[in-house]
A protein has these predicted regions:
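Short coil/turn segments at beta-strand junctions that form active-site/ligand-binding loops
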Residues: 10, 34-36, 209-211
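Short, basic and Ser/Thr-rich N-terminal targeting/leader segments
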Residues: 8, 42-44, 209
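ATP-binding/phosphotransfer module of carbohydrate and carboxylate kinases, centering on a glycine-rich
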Residues: 2, 27-28, 88-267
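Active-site neighborhood for divalent-cation/phosphate handling
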Residues: 1-27
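Glycine-rich phosphate-binding loop of actin/hexokinase-like ATP-binding domains
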Residues: 20-115, 121, 130, 134, ...
Length: 267
């Protein structure tokens, strides 16, 4: 900044978007009594932030004796132990960072198109589509998350995947089921992600005081299938199996507000 002529001394605070999402969500509900807070990004990428008791963070040394909490940026998109199949590995090899951010590649919007295309091409090779539909699918050079949703909302409309099916009813249904299966897996993995983080908070056992999960990202809010599927797995897995309760909220401009609060608190 000095090289650009800004001589005034400035205090700079660098904050991750999952962290600002948590802060922004907390600020959006001052009248609610939540047990704890989580910031979750499910858009082009994915990440998680939660509140950890300082006494449990041993690397803080003597500072760990201070009673309080610290926001933890998990970088959950880099998780590498989720079960993967051959098609996951094959798609991963085509990305700019093979072997990196494997969890993100299985659930986030930036990789959704490539993953779906990989599955559809393999399905065509195995004869799940009619010959002409299979040829059109094989000719697809790329596929975006928007094009996937265009098909899900309008399977007989003017969009790339509907064109591939050429009006063949059975092919339309097969294509829909394959996409639905991948979205189902993504929603299940997000639920597992939350199921791993919530016990770390030690909170959320009381449904009257759930953990507040501020969700941010286009995959959660714009995908036709993902939001409802996550709600279903939250109920069946987190609530009924684990006895954990959370509430998903949408905050207005959580990153902007969270960054402003972080800046003010660290000025």
């Amino acid at each position: 900044m000095k090289a650009r002529g800004h001589q005034e001394k400035k205090s700079i605070v660098l904050v991750n978007d999952a962290v600002t999402t948590l802060i922004g969500g907390k600020a959006a509900c001052p009248d609610r009594q939540f047990d704890s807070y989580i910031g979750f990004i499910w858009g082009t990428g994915t990440n998680t932030c939660y509140m950890e008791q300082t006494r449990r963070i041993t690397k803080l040394g003597s500072a760990a004796d201070i009673d309080g909490t610290m926001l933890i940026n998990v970088e959950s998109g880099g998780y590498a132990k989720a079960p993967r199949g051959d098609l996951d590995a094959g798609f991963d090899a085509t990305t700019v960072n093979p072997g990196g951010y494997m969890f993100e590649k299985m659930i986030s919007g930036a990789y959704q198109g490539g993953m779906v295309r990989t599955v559809l091409v393999q399905a065509a090779k195995e004869g799940l589509f009619t010959a002409e539909t299979g040829k059109r699918i094989a000719a697809l050079e790329s596929l975006s998350s928007k094009e996937i949703d265009d098909f899900l909302f309008r399977p007989y409309g003017e969009n790339a995947l509907a064109h591939c099916c050429g009006g063949v009813e059975e092919d339309c249904q097969t294509l829909y089921y394959l996409i639905d299966g991948l979205m189902e897996r993504a929603a299940r993995f997000v639920a597992f992600n939350l199921a791993a983080v919530m016990p770390k908070t030690g909170k959320g056992a009381n449904p009257c005081r759930p953990v507040c999960v501020t969700m941010d990202g286009s995959t959660y809010y714009k995908s036709k299938l993902c939001k409802d599927k996550l709600s279903a797995y939250t109920k069946s897995f987190l609530n009924e199996e684990l006895g954990l309760y959370c509430e998903f909220i949408k905050a207005e401009n959580p990153n902007l507000i969270g960054a402003a609060i972080a800046g003010l608190l660290n000025a």
